[in-house]
Amino acid sequence: KAASEKSGKVLMIMRNNRYYGHSVFAKNYIESGKMGEIYCGRCGWIRRRGIPGRGGWFTTKAKSGGGPLIDLGVHMIDLAIWLMGNPTPVAVSGATYRKFADNEAQSDSVHAKFGSKQENGTFDVEDLAMGMIRFDNGAVLQLEFSWASNIDHETRFVELRGTKSGLTWEGDSGVKFFSEEQGQLTDLVPHCQAGDGHVANMRHFVDVVVNHVKPDFEPIQGIN
């Protein structure tokens, strides 16, 4: 951030989840006021078996900085807080676990095919992290991220609950809204084209550099 400000260059971070079609729809829905006050939520990316590059870069804290919290969590936390309107965190609590370092079960995750397995390598990061963030507006966000845990199947999600409606965002599957109309419970399932979040993010970056539009991502959001 300091280098960007000193040089006058544009700093943006790849936050591709923001650029899916259903993410944009959800953001516009929230900003229209249809969710009301968002006061709590959950987000996670949990795998049954999906440890990337066991023994190598991913599982060596001195190189990667951490396990699924820093690998997977950053993407879902960013999406959740962005949808919530970027409130400022004031307190965080959590716990981490390393229970599958010696588990050699086959991976069932298509998202875990990164890095090469290193025999007799290092595994000193967590394989599961859970926590909660409390924000300056009183809202809370629960977190859960794992490379390996005994669950049914891999899922990545954001759930937000507002005073007027709630939503569930699920990976490439889309977004659903839960509300009521005329005294009846209603579900809204918009048919959005997901698109390629990475491509859309890069197009926005080019637009920022070439046409000087305001960046969707601001460095302070990452710092928070």
Roles of regions detected by a PLM:
Residues 152-157, 178-188:
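A short, polar/proline- and glycine-enriched secondary-structure boundary/capping micro-motif
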Residues 65-68, 118-119, 189-193, 211-220:
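Active-site rim elements
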Residues 11-13, 42, 143, 169:
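Hydrophobic residues in well-ordered beta-strands that form the structural core
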Residues 169, 192-203, 217, 224:
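Active-site loop of classical SDR/Rossmann-like NAD(P)-dependent oxidoreductases
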